[in-house]
Amino acid sequence: MANIESEAVDFEPEEDDLMDEEGTAIDGADVSPRAGHPRLKSAIAGANGESAKKTKGRGFREEKDSDRQRRLSSRDFESLGSDGRPGPQRSVEGWIILVSGVHEETQEEDITNAFGDFGEIKNLNLNLDRRSGYVKGYALIEYEKKEEAQSAISAMNGAELLTQNVSVDWAFSSGPSGGESYRRKNSRYGRSQRSRSPRRRY
């Protein structure tokens, strides 16, 4: 192994290099670099050394809760009303239905042909699997009117689309839309309890 020699540099600060505490020049005082340097004042902790105020998140504000409530109550926010009953909920733009059990090779044109008879389709979302490039197995269809979406659900739920039966229901709902159909969908083959998970291997 090679010996690496390092040369130590001795640094002696000059009088002009040192900070003076009260703005006066240092005349004949101890000029060693370890002499009492003035303490820097923190903008966070304050000049008198008080502890820093803890804040959370970006763009924090120093305001009381009442000020915040007053500021927020003066603004108009777009919101959707709800009657509180269980059933379908409208999205911001329209009524969206979820079609599940869609064949992996289904095209947007196939969905439009099957569901376009019930009303104008405002938006159609057919997600693809990145790895395979095939449809993930579901589609989201948006209608302008609730009646159009309801007629599509009634007519197409259980219907065949490209050799597969599809299930059609509301994409957004508050609680079960129908008691019996909700129980039937969420119970697996008539079992009332969930199966146990296998033991963990160590």
Curated annotation (Swiss-Prot):
Name of a matching Pfam family: RRM_1
Q: Name one GO molecular function term.
A: mRNA binding
Localization, UniProt: Nucleus, Nucleolus; Nucleus speckle; Cytoplasm
| Gene Ontology terms: biological process | mRNA processing; mRNA transport; nuclear-transcribed mRNA catabolic process, nonsense-mediated decay; positive regulation of gene expression; regulation of translation; RNA splicing
Cite the entry's keywords alphabetically: Cytoplasm, mRNA processing, mRNA splicing, mRNA transport, Nonsense-mediated mRNA decay, Nucleus, Phosphoprotein, RNA-binding, Translation regulation, Transport
Tissue specificity of this protein? Expressed in root and shoot meristems, cotyledons, vascular tissues of leaves, receptacle of flowers and siliques, and pollen grains.
The record's listing under CDD domains reads: RRM_RBM8
- Comp. bias (Basic residues): 184-202
According to its UniProt entry, what is the function of this protein?
Answer: Core component of the splicing-dependent multiprotein exon junction complex (EJC) deposited at splice junctions on mRNAs. The EJC is a dynamic structure consisting of core proteins and several peripheral nuclear and cytoplasmic associated factors that join the complex only transiently either during EJC assembly or during subsequent mRNA metabolism.
Entry protein name: RNA-binding protein Y14
Native organism is Arabidopsis thaliana
